[in-house]
């Protein structure tokens, strides 16, 4: 397995800090959390069950359909785009390595072990990363963070004291907007100044003059 890790760090050539976090943190057990700079954490993502995340293929198809132009652009779009690019590249290198190992290892048990490790362990981490950054680009980072916190609270609450259904990410923006509207004080548009009328005293003096 050490040979597998060595091959992975060599094959996964990562030019950016974000991608280096992915490789170094996973391979050598360093305390590096690729979600911290985005306000989340691995622990926060771990509240979501593994079957919550779509397959890598579905996530890659979603990223391609929604953000292909931005991902292929040489311009820097956002940190989420950069992280998404590197996660996609890393997964491609992992697949190449798994294919190479599967073709060159003579022992079927070892070959199956390596392929299974890539698909299960690394596959889940890639699925989490892809889902997080695609969701942040689609719904906004604050909404995704609110969803992760809401789901974490829901899943840790005993079934007898929580709603039957888990929170749904796609419904959070609407709820959030309604709640924010309720909090914000109603702004009153200033009315144009009216011309001040004459004081009663002045009007009274004018009436006396007219009587005279």
Swiss-Prot record:
Q: What is its main location?
A: secreted
Show the GO MF annotations. DNA binding; RNA binding; structural molecule activity
What are the start and end residues of every segment in region (Disordered)? 165-212
Cell membrane recorded as keyword: no
Q: Which domain of life is it from?
A: Viruses
Signal peptide (residue range): 1-19
Biased segments, Basic residues type: 178-205
Q: Which UniProt keywords apply?
A: Disulfide bond, Host nucleus, Host-virus interaction, Repeat, Secreted, Signal, Viral immunoevasion
Which positions does the entry assign to sequence repeats?
184-190, 191-198, 199-206
Q: Which function does this protein serve? A: May regulate immune response to the intracellular capsid in acting as a T-cell tolerogen, by having an immunoregulatory effect which prevents destruction of infected cells by cytotoxic T-cells. This immune regulation may predispose to chronicity during perinatal infections and prevent severe liver injury during adult infections.
Q: Which family does it belong to?
A: Belongs to the orthohepadnavirus precore antigen family.
What is this protein's record name?
Answer: External core antigen
Q: Which organism does this record belong to?
A: Hepatitis B virus genotype B/C subtype adw (isolate Okinawa/pODW282/1998)
């Amino acid at each position: 397995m050490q040979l597998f890790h060595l091959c992975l760090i060599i094959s996964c050539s990562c030019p950016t800090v974000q991608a280096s976090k992915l490789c170094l943190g996973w391979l050598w057990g360093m305390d590096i959390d690729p979600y911290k700079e985005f306000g989340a954490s691995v622990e926060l993502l771990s509240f979501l069950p593994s079957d919550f995340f779509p397959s890598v293929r579905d996530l890659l198809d979603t990223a391609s359909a929604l953000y292909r132009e931005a991902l292929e652009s040489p311009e820097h779009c956002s940190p989420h785009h950069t992280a998404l690019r590197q996660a996609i590249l890393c997964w491609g290198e992992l697949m190449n390595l798994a294919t190479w190992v599967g073709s060159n290892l003579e022992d079927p048990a070892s070959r199956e072990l390596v392929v299974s490790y890539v698909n299960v362990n690394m596959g889940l981490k890639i699925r989490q990363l892809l889902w997080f950054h695609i969701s942040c680009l689609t719904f906004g980072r604050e909404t995704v963070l609110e969803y992760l916190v809401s789901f974490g609270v829901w899943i840790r609450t005993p079934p007898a004291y929580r709603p039957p259904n888990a929170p749904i990410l796609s419904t959070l923006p609407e709820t959030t907007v309604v709640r924010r509207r309720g909090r914000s004080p109603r702004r009153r548009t200033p009315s144009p100044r009216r011309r001040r009328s004459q004081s009663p005293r002045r009007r009274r003096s004018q009436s006396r003059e007219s009587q005279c």
